[in-house]
């Protein structure tokens, strides 16, 4: 039996993936055994066979389509042999120390459903640690600022920089370490999300089963954010639209009654208003790519809401669970 199975979902991120895999194969430890599984979400660019030759010790699986991050993670986990699962982005570079600390922390604390660590980018900036589950007080920009202000002292105490471990509501899916037992307890990743918020959902399900979400500050990995989702303007608009769609899916999954309908309604109104203004700005300043992308986001959002009304579902048409009973 393997101790740790690393699962990576890839979509045309071959250059980043190569660096990631090279960092993995250099890890040699007598304290744990590793296997690595790469699920390619049908990149269809001829690189998969090349990588199979470059990295013969790694298991490469080709998915049936670009089925999303959650579906790819579940496919990788279903082929994994490890007692522990380490879900990793292809645009990360890891080290033995981080893997060992993640494994030890998870092993010694069976009530920790999910464990993650610090992440730094190319400029050595740390990714945020303070993350909240979406609710009325945290889902919108202004309400989130007010929430942080009103809870300043409690948040400062909870995330005190002297602490080696902190417990946010959720951690990013770029680095998620969990036992096989916990993965099975929460029934894996929810495939209703095509991209984004599946990590928020996984952490929410874990907390609902009384599992803790832990971030250890004594370990660190490099994470080049947005490696697979910022290829061009239309791709960037697509992925940013999916963030908004996934917010609706999360609310649909985890809220109920009047509260659910209220949040969904407010979310629709706020997003349409914001994206309409940004789209107008993008039309006026069409020569600025960062602004022009907002035109495509607004179009995508209108099409999504039309489809959501006609099909009576919040799920993205790109999800493998779209229109499934």
Feature locations, PLM:
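A short, conserved alpha-helix in the catalytic core of glycosyltransferases
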Residues: 163, 169-220
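Glycine-rich, basic loop-to-helix element that forms the pyrophosphate-binding segment
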Residues: 62-80
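Short aromatic/hydrophobic "clamp" motif used to bind/position activated sugar donors
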Residues: 85
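Active-site-adjacent helix/loop segment of glycosyltransferases
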Residues: 208, 212-289, 293
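A conserved acidic beta->alpha catalytic loop
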Residues: 23, 40-48, 65
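Short, well-formed alpha-helical segments that are part of the catalytic scaffolds
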Residues: 13-26
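Conserved donor NDP-sugar-binding/catalytic core segment of glycosyltransferases
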Residues: 96-130
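Short, flexible, basic/aromatic active-site loop/helix in glycosyltransferases
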Residues: 135-168
